[in-house]
């Protein structure tokens, strides 16, 4: 994090690290720590002291909570990294290459433009769905196309409406347990249903 020099970094560990949901991290650069408070506070809120002590008191004990998801992170990093002969670098290369192949396979069918260059893809890719004049749903509702893909074909893939663009997007995620054949199946279904 020091090399990155970011003021703040946060991320979920459940997707790529295969840890339980709720296992996330928050990094706050030391010069920013006085600016950040937890949503719910505990006894640490009234304690005076240096910021390194205070931030731990405020964030670490915010009520009754099971710390198991966080405690899984180190072992998960080690275990998942061991699934490739090339460690995490090999896993990320695999995910990136599969995500690009998945996107390209789908774009061949949809004939919609690439949304970004390959260099911006790591493990996720998004494709623009054809402008099919389907009314956009609220962010709180499941998109009807998402529901159709899931119920009729057992495909779980997010479909998002973006009202600002008046368009919908389909997003894929690629990991070690995915195969190109799954994305080819998705492309066949898209060709049939769109």
Per-region residue spans from a language model:
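Helix-coil boundary/capping segments in enzymes
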Residues: 45, 53, 77-78, 126-131, ...
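Structural motif of enzymes handling amino- and sulfur-group chemistry
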Residues: 48-106, 123
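PLP-dependent enzyme catalytic core of the Aspartate aminotransferase-like
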Residues: 138-140, 147, 151-152, 156-194
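Short Gly/Pro-enriched turn/cap motifs at secondary-structure boundaries
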Residues: 14-17, 62, 116-117
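Active-site PLP attachment segment
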Residues: 4-49
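Short acidic/glycine-enriched loop/turn segments that link adjacent beta-strands
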Residues: 20, 121, 165-168
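Conserved PLP-binding catalytic core of the aspartate aminotransferase-like
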Residues: 92-100, 107-152
């Amino acid at each position: 994090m020091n090399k990155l020099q970011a003021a703040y970094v946060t991320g979920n560990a459940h997707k790529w690290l295969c840890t339980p949901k709720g296992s996330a991290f928050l990094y706050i650069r030391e010069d920013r720590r006085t600016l950040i408070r937890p949503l719910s506070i505990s006894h640490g809120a009234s304690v005076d002291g240096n910021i390194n002590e205070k931030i731990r008191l405020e964030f670490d004990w915010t009520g009754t909570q099971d710390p198991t998801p966080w405690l899984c992170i180190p072992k998960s990093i080690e275990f998942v990294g061991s699934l490739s002969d090339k460690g995490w670098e090999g896993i990320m290369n695999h995910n990136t290459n599969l995500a690009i192949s998945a996107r390209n396979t789908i774009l061949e069918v949809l004939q919609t433009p690439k949304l970004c260059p390959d260099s911006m893809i790591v493990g996720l890719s998004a494709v623009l769905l054809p402008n099919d004049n389907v009314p956009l749903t609220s962010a709180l509702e499941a998109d009807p196309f998402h529901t159709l893909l899931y119920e009729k074909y057992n495909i779980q893939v997010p479909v998002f409406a973006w009202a600002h663009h008046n368009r919908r997007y389909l997003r894929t995620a690629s990991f070690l347990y995915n195969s190109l054949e799954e994305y080819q199946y998705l492309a066949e279904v898209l060709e049939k249903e769109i």
